[in-house]
């Protein structure tokens, strides 16, 4: 195949480029900095004043922490979309649980609700 078909075309607009350049210019590339602090404070204010908000480095880290906080442990089964990047399932394995992959609908690419129901009842 000579021509790549992108599922989602890569794109970075002017705003993203500005913030990336600002991070390099101020040497706040990782792990934290004023943009992360502003994001956390803004999200905390939007959601609630009584809870803490923490920005993480990736969706994988967020799923990992969510599984731990939900009490998922070794031997548990966790339903997982089959049409995904491996990083969606890796945290399930990190906590010792078993990913159970649910296939997608061909017209939406979303998890098939019928197959989801079957997996829950199984």
Locate the predicted segments by residue.
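PLP-dependent aminotransferase-like
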Residues: 68, 72-122
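Alpha-helix N-cap/helix-start motif at coil-to-helix transitions, marked by capping-box chemistry
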Residues: 10-14, 37, 86
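N-terminal "arm"/small-domain region of PLP-dependent enzymes with the aminotransferase-like
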Residues: 1-30
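An amphipathic alpha-helix/helix-turn recognition signal
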Residues: 18, 57, 61, 83-87
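Phosphate-binding glycine-rich loop
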Residues: 32-77, 91-93, 101-103
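Aromatic-acidic/polar surface patches that form glycan- and anion
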Residues: 10-13, 32, 55, 109
């Amino acid at each position: 195949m000579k021509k790549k078909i992108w599922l989602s075309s890569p794109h970075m607009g002017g705003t993203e480029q500005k913030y990336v350049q600002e991070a390099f210019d101020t040497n706040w590339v990782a792990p934290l900095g004023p943009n992360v602090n502003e994001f956390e404070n803004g999200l905390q204010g939007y959601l609630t004043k009584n809870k803490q908000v923490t920005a993480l480095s990736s969706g994988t880290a967020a799923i990992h922490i969510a599984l731990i906080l939900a009490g998922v442990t070794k031997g548990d089964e966790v339903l997982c979309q089959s049409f995904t990047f491996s990083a969606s399932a890796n945290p399930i394995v990190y906590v010792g649980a078993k990913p159970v992959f649910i296939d997608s609908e061909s017209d939406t690419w979303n998890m098939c609700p019928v197959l989801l129901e079957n997996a829950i009842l199984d």
